Amino acid sequence: MEELETIAKEFGGVRAAFAVQAGREVRVIASAKEADDNVAAKICRDIAAAYQERLSYPGEIKVVVIRESRFTELAK
């Protein structure tokens, strides 16, 4: 599972990666500043392709890229 996270973190714009469900799913947090929607989709495809090329595993690995912006203001 660490190898899944390590491969995902190699891509530009990726802030964090977490393997869940015994390595059947990888959730990738993309930087909203570095990756727009199109870049996030490309990162997702590229990570999945890297897994296919570099790893041997039974079944499938689902790759989910999450890109969000949060804004917070306090009214006093």
Give a label for each model feature.
Residues 16-20, 55-62:
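Flexible, glycine/charged-enriched surface loops at secondary-structure junctions
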Residues 21, 30-32, 65-67:
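Flexible glycine-/small-residue-rich
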Residues 69-76:
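Short, low-order "capping/linker" segments at domain edges
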Residues 26-41:
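A short interface-forming secondary-structure element
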Residues 4, 39-59:
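Short, non-transmembrane amphipathic alpha-helical segments
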Residues 1-7, 34:
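A glycine-rich beta-turn/hairpin centered on an aromatic-Pro dipeptide
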Residues 8, 28, 63:
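Residue-level signature of catalytic and energy-coupling elements of molecular machines
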Residues 8, 14-17:
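Short acidic amphipathic segments
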